[in-house]
């Protein structure tokens, strides 16, 4: 009997906006607005659309939106989970990225499950909650093989944001480390990628090892 391979991805999104630590209500809650579930805590608001592939459609701090909306691009907006490598999983399966997910709330955890799909052979589960200890958003993605074939894939977290400065601690030297991103540079153990609004007129990629398990924008 074939074992069901499972891939787990833990993501911690911390809001770095000044002023988020406030005297407002210090209890997290989950509210449903049509097919969108809104997780909120203090000055944070985090919205996930069950009807749009379990996509993260909004992340706000002090009412300031950090993710791009469908007004920027009708298809590629917000934040989502993809399968990789792109050479084998493109375009993304609709059941993973676009079709409705089944939603349930377990205490203070929002759980979304994609329907088992015979074409992709996978089912994706997404869990979202808020850590009241440090105001971070806890995201847990898992992929289940529902086919009878071996699956080789890796998780790919995709986040679309407005222009700004992205940075992360660089890891070890690797032959895969390469970039054609305009303006990116390495300094003091960090990779810095300035991306002003309106300046990216072509597709660009930066491939790099990382250290510390975080990236900030």
Which residues are covered by each model-predicted region?
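Bacterial N-terminal signal peptides that target proteins for export
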Residues: 1-8
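Hydrophobic beta-strand positions in extracellular immunoglobulin-like domains
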Residues: 142-143
């Amino acid at each position: 009997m074939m074992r069901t391979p499972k891939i787990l991805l833990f993501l911690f999104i911390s809001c770095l906006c000044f002023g988020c630590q406030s005297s407002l209500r210090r209890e997290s809650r989950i509210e449903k607005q049509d097919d969108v579930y809104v997780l909120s805590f203090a000055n944070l608001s985090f919205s996930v659309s069950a009807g749009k592939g379990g996509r993260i459609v909004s992340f706000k701090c002090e009412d300031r939106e950090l993710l791009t909306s469908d007004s920027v691009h009708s298809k590629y907006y917000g934040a989502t989970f993809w399968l990789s490598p792109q050479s084998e999983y493109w375009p993304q399966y609709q059941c993973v990225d676009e079709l409705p997910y089944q939603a349930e709330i377990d205490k203070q955890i929002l759980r979304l499950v994609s329907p088992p799909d015979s074409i992709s052979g996978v089912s994706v589960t997404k869990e979202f909650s808020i850590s009241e200890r440090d105001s971070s958003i806890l995201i847990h993605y898992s992929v289940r093989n529902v086919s009878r074939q071996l699956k080789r894939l890796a998780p790919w977290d995709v986040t679309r944001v407005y222009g700004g400065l992205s940075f992360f601690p660089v890891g070890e030297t690797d032959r895969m480390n390469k970039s054609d991103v305009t303006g990116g540079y390495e300094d003091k153990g960090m990779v810095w990628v300035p991306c002003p609004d309106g300046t990216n007129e072509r597709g660009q990629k930066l491939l790099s090892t990382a250290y510390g398990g975080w990236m900030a924008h």
